[in-house]
């Protein structure tokens, strides 16, 4: 009896534990997704108390700017009317450092900030030195010539004489460092002296001179603390909610984020939209495929073929015109009226006539397409590669001798890649907190439920087995009683009806 009572207590305890496990598993199945969502919402918003705030304030991911220049092989031939020939030089790689300053939280659920960038040359990652010489179009001379195209002949003659006096030619031979960060040019001083405010710079002229040790404008974005539906969206840039560079309200709108984080809980139907001060416009990327980066699930977003399409191919882009061939965007209105164009490198995804007009271009998606890999649950970029090309439209301008017989062509100057990937301790922490722990909780809830069900079965089985034993004992006892009664009746029959000798013989038998 003691063993039986003890067994009952053990099975009852196991059943109680199983019930607790099962209930806990069910509660976790119901509650864990909601808890994870609340934690994500709490920690991706722009709040000094959130886990991602320091990452947003000073990006821990190493960014690199890789620059490729198109060296002009036949500058004199181009002036005489020949087809341009180019050779790609690079990459010249720079480490890009970013940090936010003047962070001000406003009363309308927004935060304002300036983001500063600085660059350091990385010789070990580069294919060449900043002292390398590159032959490229003289942007100042050719742009000024285009601006004078419809001016009186006397002004053109005066400009030709000024160019000659200052030693200016249609093509120049400068070092990579000068092209990137600026060089002294007497033409700049002359223009600023006689045509003040016509150029956005007063000193040296360089393609990236305005970006080094400077900010990209005052961004005001929504924090998501009070209204999560607008988290990271740009409210204003430099105090305005839309720009005035383009010819339609849609093209002038400042849409999306500042390009660093997006709203969490993305789906394949989501898109990535951001405002780029360098491109002077908002851009939208579209979902392509799922992937994995460092063990972290990602969504890859890429540029649609219509990103730089002209208005005849994609009517919503009509506001960015005047346009030339499809696949390049005229950015002259926000680049001191110089005939500059933005596109994918080597005119990838553009009208084929653009690449065919210049020898040495070989567009292909593997090398020249851009992408962003985003963790869909948090909206945080894991790996990105943004590639863009800057080109100059050049042609002969009658009356300006320096332009000679240059045939109309969109001539590529350079293309660059801004890339960054989460790595090291940052990647490990991100993986543990936002991938591993949710995965452990996900499996734990089902393990608890399964274990609870197994433990609940033990007392049930024990009870069934106990009832079976009682039944068998009762059956065997009842059967034994009937057998004894039959033997006794048979013996009495023999004693009363058979002769005595027979009984003795039967007994002996």
Swiss-Prot record:
Pfam families: CD36. It is found in: Cell membrane; Membrane, Caveola. GO terms for biological process: adhesion of symbiont to host; blood vessel endothelial cell migration; cholesterol catabolic process; cholesterol efflux; cholesterol homeostasis; cholesterol import; detection of lipopolysaccharide; endothelial cell proliferation. It comes from the Eukaryota. Residues 1-11, 462-509 are cytoplasmic. The keyword Membrane applies. Disulfide bonds join 251-384. Residues 33-440 are extracellular. The keyword Coiled coil does not apply. It is a multi-pass membrane protein. InterPro entries: CD36_fam. Glycans are attached at residues 102, 108, 173, 212, 227, 255, 310, 330, 383. Keywords: Cell membrane, Disulfide bond, Glycoprotein, Membrane, Receptor, Transmembrane, Transmembrane helix. One of its GO terms (molecular function) is apolipoprotein A-I binding. GO terms for cellular component: caveola; cell surface; lysosome. Belongs to the CD36 family. This is Scavenger receptor class B member 1. It comes from Bos taurus (Bovine). The gene is SCARB1.
């Amino acid at each position: 009896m003691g063993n039986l009572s003890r067994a009952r207590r053990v099975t009852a305890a196991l059943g109680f534990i199983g019930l607790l496990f099962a209930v806990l598993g069910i509660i976790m199945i119901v509650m864990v997704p909601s808890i994870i969502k609340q934690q994500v919402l709490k920690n991706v918003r722009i709040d000094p108390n959130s886990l991602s705030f320091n990452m947003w304030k000073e990006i821990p991911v190493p960014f690199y700017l890789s620059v490729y220049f198109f060296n002009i092989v036949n500058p004199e031939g181009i002036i005489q009317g020949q087809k341009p020939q180019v050779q790609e030089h690079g990459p010249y790689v720079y480490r890009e450092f970013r940090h936010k300053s003047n962070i001000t939280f406003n009363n309308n659920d927004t935060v304002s900030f300036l983001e500063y960038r600085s660059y350091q040359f990385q010789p070990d990652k580069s294919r060449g030195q900043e002292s390398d010489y590159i032959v490229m179009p003289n942007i100042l001379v050719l742009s000024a010539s285009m601006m004078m195209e419809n001016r009186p002949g006397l002004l053109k003659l005066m400009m030709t004489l000024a160019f000659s006096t200052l030693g200016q030619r249609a093509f120049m031979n400068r070092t990579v460092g000068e092209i990137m960060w600026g060089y002294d040019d007497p033409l700049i001083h002359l223009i600023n002296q006689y045509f003040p405010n016509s150029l956005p710079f007063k000193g040296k002229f360089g393609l990236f001179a305005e970006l080094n040790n400077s900010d990209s404008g005052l961004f005001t974005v929504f924090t998501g603390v009070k209204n999560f539906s607008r988290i990271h969206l740009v409210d204003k840039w430099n105090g305005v909610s839309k720009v005035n560079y383009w010819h339609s309200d849609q093209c002038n709108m400042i849409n999306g984020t500042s390009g660093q984080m997006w709203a969490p809980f993305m789906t394949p139907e989501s898109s990535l939209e951001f405002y780029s001060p360098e491109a002077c416009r908002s851009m939208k990327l579209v979902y392509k495929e799922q992937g994995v980066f460092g063990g972290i699930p990602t969504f890859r977003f890429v540029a649609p073929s219509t990103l730089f399409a002209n208005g005849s191919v994609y009517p919503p882009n009509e506001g960015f015109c005047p346009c030339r061939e499809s696949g390049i965007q005229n950015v002259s209105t926000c680049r001191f009226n110089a005939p500059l164009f933005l596109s994918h490198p080597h005119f990838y995804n553009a009208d084929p006539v653009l690449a065919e007009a210049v020898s040495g271009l070989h567009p292909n998606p593997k090398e020249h397409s851009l992408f962003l890999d985003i963790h869909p649950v948090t909206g945080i970029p894991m790996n990105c590669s943004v590639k863009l090309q800057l080109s100059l439209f050049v042609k002969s301008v009658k009356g300006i001798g320096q332009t000679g017989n240059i045939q109309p062509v969109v001539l590529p100057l350079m293309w660059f890649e801004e890339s960054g990937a989460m790595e090291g301790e940052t990647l490990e922490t991100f993986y543990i907190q936002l991938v591993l722990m949710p995965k452990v909780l996900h499996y734990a809830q089902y393990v608890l439920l399964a274990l609870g069900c197994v433990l609940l079965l033990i007392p049930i089985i024990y009870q069934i087995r106990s009832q079976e034993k009682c039944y068998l004992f009762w059956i065997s006892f009842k059967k034994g009683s009937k057998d004894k009664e039959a033997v006794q009746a048979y013996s009495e029959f023999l004693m009363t009806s058979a002769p005595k000798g027979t009984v003795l013989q039967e007994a002996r038998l």
